[in-house]
């Protein structure tokens, strides 16, 4: 994880911690309880789907799918991760959706990725009111940006309805393109993920699965005070979401003042480019950063992206090295000169266990 994100989380950490609540119908979500609006969604569900292609000039026929949705809480309910797998006349697909709660706005974001390219789609944003969740954002249709609306409704402890619609006239009218009716199978999510051992690049992060203790040297202000470091400690746990294209790492760190800092890294494999995209978020901001992108070569993983430090746009680089069965190392650095020189911002050493 990146030092800047950790210390941003330290600055934004809530003055009071809101405790976890048992699953409840979303109609009770208001004020601070909005962060528990998705508690009803935790568990394992049967889904019946119908989907169709919609463009400004045509509306396709409905295609039906049947499958399973598994949703698990993260960060004590301030985030959740949904897995979906379904089959039908239109084929078979796997996907995941990450939901993040932003305590500053009191809203949720929703972002989907499919197994075909391992790329998070643009988010929709919204909240729940009177038992109904309404989210808005952008999507693409016919190569053009159009408005998208997602609605969660008819929510009971054992069922709910979900649909997606597009608007080609700025929100005046909407055309539904995706409908799902879900029925609960289990209150608890099925955490077990089928695993097929392999040596291809889609298995590059297999070494990291499990629980680790981590020691961190972080540089809070790498541009103005690159030599000033802070020592942090915590735990890092990684597990598979889908066998060969998605996994997640969660980091918990004891931050300043005894506050617990929670970060996650969602790692998605692109089968076409044979690269990984790593998306980062923390529970204090509740937003998903643009990914760092890269691959492993000769036992070293290198990932590069863009970031902002002290108001400046910079390159950021994440390197995994010294990988063994019981330990590994991560180095983060930034560059203000296009990658010619790098300033260290973060070094972590992980040991299995913790």
Model-derived regions: residue spans:
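Hydrophobic small-molecule pocket/channel-lining residues, especially in calycin-type beta-barrels
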Residues: 25-354
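Bacterial N-terminal signal peptides
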Residues: 9-19
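N-terminal twin-arginine translocation
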Residues: 21-23
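A detector of low-complexity, intrinsically disordered, Ser/Thr/Gly/Pro/Ala-rich segments
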Residues: 4, 15-16, 26, 314
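Bacterial N-terminal signal peptides that target proteins for export
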Residues: 2-10
